[in-house]
Curated annotation (Swiss-Prot):
Lineage, uppermost ranks: Bacteria, Pseudomonadati, Pseudomonadota, Gammaproteobacteria, Enterobacterales
Entry-annotated residues carrying S-(dipyrrolylmethanemethyl)cysteine: 243
Name used for this protein in its record: Porphobilinogen deaminase
Catalytic activity: 4 porphobilinogen + H2O = hydroxymethylbilane + 4 NH4(+)
Family, per entry: Belongs to the HMBS family.
Top-rank EC class of the record's enzyme: transferase
Organism: Blochmanniella floridana
Cofactor(s) required, per the database record: dipyrromethane
A single GO BP: protoporphyrinogen IX biosynthetic process
Sorted UniProt keywords: Porphyrin biosynthesis, Transferase
Tagged with keyword Transferase: yes
Pathway: Porphyrin-containing compound metabolism; protoporphyrin-IX biosynthesis; coproporphyrinogen-III from 5-aminolevulinate: step 2/4
Length: 311
């Protein structure tokens, strides 16, 4: 009898394929006889990369929806995602049983001439489509010009070398996985540019009733990463239910406690509200929810901005 092949749904981008291969290799380490097959899929997010307008951002979940359909329709057994792309609510048929060990969560400053954000001359152009990054950069350097930057990582670097930007901001994890760290000028500390929820984390999704696959994936489960994401995700789940503003949340485990930092701000960087807290590991989700509530209260106190207008 022929062994079952584990079918892995993935986006077609080089980074997504790289992440899927990482999962394949990890599975083969724990299950040497396993057979795998990649199922590359073009997602709504991929087709929108070159057509979306500046005012109409790519919606959360656009990079995973078609992969989830493949799972629900039994065209794939697992799907590999960047955790930061995963929606707050999953389809009722699906579950994320495994978060792999977190890679470097930081953002990278990439430039040909300049070593860091602070060295850029007034009027320099930075490329990033992330509201989170734009907000925090504008708060530090309101004299810089920020333009949207889309495409896969190699395309973005090519645009930098073509002179369309003086610098671009990319995730360290993606550059590392693609062996492109030679382009990094500065690894930006989270205190300067707080990462997105789930940045640097690979998530594996499957059908909720597929007990055999869930068991097969279990060696890849990383407890510390999962606790951090539970805390970070509580922040974004709460705040995204109220508005679509720049949000960041990043948790670390230190001395057997969870340390969570979070922020919310206006896209122009004129207002950023920050908070942080420490809790025992069993209170990770509660910590995230409490900080999110505090952020929203402080944001309303410090601005007359109608958060409901950005739903």
């Amino acid at each position: 009898m022929q062994a079952k092949i584990l079918r892995i749904a993935t986006r077609k981008s080089p980074l997504a394929i790289c992440q899927a291969c990482y999962v394949c290799n990890k599975l083969k380490h724990y299950h040497p006889h396993i057979q795998t097959e990649l199922i590359p899929i073009i997602t709504t997010g991929d087709t929108s990369l070159h057509t979306v307008s500046k005012t109409n951002k790519i919606k959360k979940g656009a990079f995973i929806k078609e992969l989830e359909y493949a799972l629900i329709e039994h065209r794939a057994d697992i799907a590999v995602h960047s955790m930061k792309d995963v929606t707050v609510l999953l389809p009722k048929e699906l579950i994320i049983p495994v978060l792999c060990k977190r890679h470097d969560p930081r953002d990278a400053f990439v430039s040909i001439q300049y070593p860091n954000i602070h060295s850029l001359p007034t009027g320099s152009i930075i490329g990033t489509s992330s509201l989170r990054r734009q907000c925090q950069i504008r708060a530090q350097r309101s004299d810089l010009i920020l333009h949207d930057l889309r495409g896969n990582i190699n395309t973005r670097i090519k645009k930098l070398h073509q002179g369309q930007y003086n610098a671009i901001i990319l995730a360290v994890a993606g550059l590392t996985r693609l062996k492109l760290t030679k382009y990094i000028q500065t690894y930006i500390d989270p205190s300067e540019l707080l990462p997105a929820m789930g940045q640097g984390v690979i998530a594996i999704e499957c059908r909720i009733n597929d007990i055999n696959t869930i068991s097969l994936l279990s060696p890849l489960y990383h407890k510390e990463t999962s606790l951090c994401i539970k805390s970070e995700r509580a922040v974004t789940t709460y705040l995204e239910s109220y508005c679509r503003l720049p949000i960041a949340s990043y948790a670390e485990i230190q001395n057997n406690q969870i340390w969570l930092r979070a922020l919310i701000g206006l896209p122009d960087g004129s207002i950023i509200i920050r908070t942080e807290g420490i809790a025992s590991l069993d209170k990770a989700e509660e910590l995230g929810l409490n900080l999110a509530k505090d952020l929203l209260i402080q944001f309303k106190k410090n601005t007359h901005f109608d958060i409901n207008s950005i739903k």
